[in-house]
Amino acid sequence: CSSDLLYAKKNHNNPLATSFLPTTRAEMDKLGWDQCDVILVSGDAYIDSPFIGVAVVGRMLEKLGYKVGIIGQPDYESDKDIKRLGEPRLYWGVSGGSIDSMVANYTATKKFRNSDDYTPGGKNNKRPDRAVLVYTNLIRRYFKDTVPIVLGGIEASLRRVTHYDYWQNKLKKPILFDSKADILIYGMGEIALMQLTTAINNKTDYKDIR
């Protein structure tokens, strides 16, 4: 990861060491940013904690010198949230959140859950079913011909290959086909994401990563 560290040494100025990663245009302006390098979209509210995958990934990329913004639980019926940080320079990162959205929204008997520990107030009214698909489609709808969309997190990881869908009682294709995203990183993907970010930043073909 020497190129990552070199990028960090050249570009890293850490005004965020004791604050949150930006979630609004006003917060970006306060940091003097015209554009984020990476925007992470999550089915959870943004909690700056080592227990939250998106926060960990965001802080890791920040330490390497990249400008990272986070959109937590965007409104999926309008453009007001997904467009508030603009378009990233390198890629979008999309996660359904810390819990698979279908598990977060329904019990094993398919009854809707009224509570969500990762939503402000604890009320389950912010996370859509199949959040990864919804957020990816939201980006595609409002940003035509955008930079790559990278999927990660438990929801995408569990659906990375052909799989049985309990909710629809049928086999489903890998989520990359249904979502029309570009890349999927599964499991503990910090190293892979570092390599991917370096490749995209250096304008090299990420398909050659091994």
Task: Walk through the language-model features, giving the residues of each.
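Short, small-residue-biased leader/transition segments that mark boundaries at the very start
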Residues: 1-2
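Acidic/glycine-enriched edge-of-secondary-structure segments
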Residues: 6-15, 64-65, 116-128
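Catalytic cores of nucleic-acid editing and processing enzymes
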Residues: 9-12, 41, 79
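Long, low-complexity, serine/threonine- and charged-residue-rich intrinsically disordered N-terminal tails
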Residues: 26-29, 40-44
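A short, charged/proline- and glycine-enriched loop
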Residues: 31-38, 88
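Glycine-rich beta-alpha loop elements in corrinoid/cobalamin-binding modules
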Residues: 45, 53, 72-210
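Short helix-loop-beta junction
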Residues: 56-68
